[in-house]
């Protein structure tokens, strides 16, 4: 798996996959999870090159998922894609180990800009 996309909205997971392809990353293997609990299970199957996660999800928030990921992997790039993106949330995310944060709605160019330094 190259990218793990974690969002409780199936529509948003599809939008993210499409944005990744439109940004020129058609050959990447994108795996999906509905929440942090399911995402942790997916991580047992292998380490992605990048994790994209929503912030607000049932069962386990994106922030809690990030903290659990960072307990075992401090290097995998982790980006939040969320509709709530206050300065306080950005500080909390970055201080917890996030690599970047994107606001919804986003454009394919926003995705490309975030992915270029990570996947090249």
Role assignments for model-derived ranges:
Residues 54, 82:
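Active-site residues of response regulator receiver
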Residues 64, 85-100:
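Alpha4 helix (beta4-alpha4-beta5 surface) of REC/receiver domains from two-component response regulators
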Residues 41, 63-74:
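Short amphipathic alpha-helix used as the core "switch/output" element in two-component signaling
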Residues 10-31:
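Two-component/phosphorelay signaling modules centered on CheY-like receiver
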Residues 46-52:
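Active-site beta3 strand of CheY-like receiver
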Residues 106-115:
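C-terminal output helix
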Residues 32-41, 62:
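Helix N-cap/capping motif at the beta->alpha junctions
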Residues 57:
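Receiver (REC) domain active-site loop signature in two-component systems and cognate sites
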């Amino acid at each position: 798996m190259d990218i793990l996309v974690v969002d409780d909205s199936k529509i948003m997971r599809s939008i993210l996959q499409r944005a990744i392809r439109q940004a020129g990353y058609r050959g990447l293997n994108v795996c999906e999870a509905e929440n942090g609990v399911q995402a942790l299970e997916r991580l047992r199957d292998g380490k992605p090159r990048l994790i994209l996660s929503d912030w607000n999800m049932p069962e386990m928030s994106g922030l809690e998922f990030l903290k659990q990921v960072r307990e075992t992997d401090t290097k995998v790039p982790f980006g939040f894609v969320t509709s709530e993106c206050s300065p306080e949330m950005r500080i909390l995310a970055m201080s917890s180990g996030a690599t970047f944060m994107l606001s919804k709605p986003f454009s394919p160019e926003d995705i490309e800009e975030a992915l270029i330094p990570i996947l090249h």
